[in-house]
Amino acid sequence: MADFQKILIANRGEIAIRVMRAANELGKRNVAVYAEEDKLGLHSFKEDEAYKIGEGLGPVAAYLSIEGILRVAKACGADAIHPGYGLLSENPDFVDACTEAGIAFIGPKAQTMRQLGDKASARRVAIEAGVPVIPATEVLGEDMAQIKAQAAAVGYPLMLKASW
């Protein structure tokens, strides 16, 4: 594990507080970001430093602003970003942007997110790795004859899941 000294937590509320607690236990400095609507939120007071993001944006858009979060990370000298969960935590473009900015992303690699980010791709990765999987089909189109044939081949009962 890399030795980060200052971690920007790119999330809000209880999620940010939980990440902050863990980082504090490791002796790391924490940086909070907060949207205007969260300026009185506990996470913006519990961190070592706190910076407002997303001027003129709503709260969700503020926390989804890759540019805004990276701007704060660079300005305050954070050497790592922890995304928490939700928001940018599953966005491979955010991971790429952190890497390009020279800031470590605490989480999976962008390639891993891309491979496992949808059910069909994740299934192929599992099969290639030798992980047992239940019978299924590849993503089907709109040809009802093909769909019926694939359903019969897999067997009943069936469970249908959207793949995108």
Residue ranges and their predicted role:
Residues 1-164:
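N-terminal beta-alpha lobe that positions the nucleotide/phosphoryl donor
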